[in-house]
Amino acid sequence: MTIYTFTSSEPHIAIVGGGIVGVILTLGLLRQNVSVRLYEQSAGFREIGAGIAFTASARRCMELMDPAIIDALRRCGAVSVSDKVADEDDHLRWIDGYNQHSKAHPTYQKPLAEICGSGFQGCRRDQLLEELAKHIPSGTIMFHKRLDTIQQGKDHKMILNFVDGSSNQADAVIGCDGIKSRVRQHLFGDNHPASFPQYTHKVAYRGLVPMDRAIEILGTWKAHNFHHHVGPGAHLTHYPVANHTALNVVVFLSDETPWPDSTTMVSKGTRSEVEKALQGWHPTVLGIVNLLPDELSKWALFDQGEFPLPHYSKGRICLAGDAAHASSPHHGAGACLGVEDALCLSTLLSQVRTTLTQADEGSKDKSESSMGQLLEAAFETFNLVRRTRTQWLVNSSRRVCDLYHQQEWADPIRCPKAETCFEEIRDRSYKIWHFDVDGMLEQTRT
């Protein structure tokens, strides 16, 4: 394990939230010899065992931050659709999940569209966090630290107060504490609508299916490749994880009713609820649903779409990942853009550290003032570089789900209209996948 050394004149960063983005940002800062400590409210890393996928551009961001991040991704069984553009399997595919087009071949599903997937790689969230944590030095992560308030001390330090009564200091704070971000609430106040996420009127039922069972329903080729099954008011997505030993399955349903409890985004659900909602769908879709456990978690999908954040930073406090731009998962890119955030921030804060170590420090008061100005400027630059792209993702994710759930899929006369949506989906997807990482880094230097 690499040993990192820091001096007291260099900035010390506090990261709140030990999810994927918080841990990757911690590794990126450590790689740049930026002093950092990560605070996580749980007793340990808490990510669920659901699947997560990263684009080629997101993995390039990981590589630029620290090659150990990519190594961790590979060790936890990340599997690729393909990194070869010419590979016939390197596609995301949309197929008709509702209509039966051939009575003679009841398992046949009409292909609707395919888009070059640009090298998506998927794995389990919990396994990735476990592997990433192996690269973080002892003492860098503090568990059981639920943030209460943030104050600025007389010495310009940021004081983090935790609900257990303890406090810690830092020169700057980055909130990576997810969709329910306490740091976001601190920045905007409890009365600002952007402080809290909003219900998108979509729910998701997630589960992992053994690959051998999935092959019995889907066939070998379809089971080992990414597919969306679309239809009226719902869609089912699946892709392989864990070195192709399991199939990650997610069923998304439209829900016109209000979510009953705004304090929690998950409730108990059942497979029978999904089967009822998908009554009349293609038998292949129903066959995959039948492989899910009887008891399921029902996840309400919230985002920042109704009230986007007007800015991502204020003073020496900044937001990144879902804390800044929580999105519904229909592009499968929320974590990818969070990784882009992490590269941008680690680059900017490395520049702050370099400037401070090269400058004539002068008096302590001058040094503290200079550090504060540099940190605030770094966070303002992050806001300028990242906000437009990430807020676009929030809106675009809602849009593509609406296209997946068109009622026209169930109408033979109107179905051809629904099928025209894929040109729009292609354009939106390419904007995410073919990201100019070098251009982003150049913006941090201007």
From Swiss-Prot:
Keywords per UniProt: FAD, Flavoprotein, Glycoprotein, Membrane, Monooxygenase, Oxidoreductase, Transmembrane, Transmembrane helix
Similarity comment: family membership: Belongs to the paxM FAD-dependent monooxygenase family.
Protein name: FAD-dependent monooxygenase eupB
Annotated source species: Phoma sp
Membrane topology: Single-pass membrane protein
Matching PANTHER family: FAD-BINDING DOMAIN-CONTAINING PROTEIN-RELATED, HYDROXYLASE, PUTATIVE (AFU_ORTHOLOGUE AFUA_3G01460)-RELATED
Pathway: Secondary metabolite biosynthesis; terpenoid biosynthesis
Cystine crosslinks: none
GO BP terms in the entry: secondary metabolite biosynthetic process; terpenoid biosynthetic process
Keyword Amino-acid biosynthesis: no
Higher taxonomy: Eukaryota, Fungi, Dikarya, Ascomycota, Pezizomycotina
Main location: membrane
Domain of life: Eukaryota
Localization (cell): Membrane
Transmembrane segments: 10-30
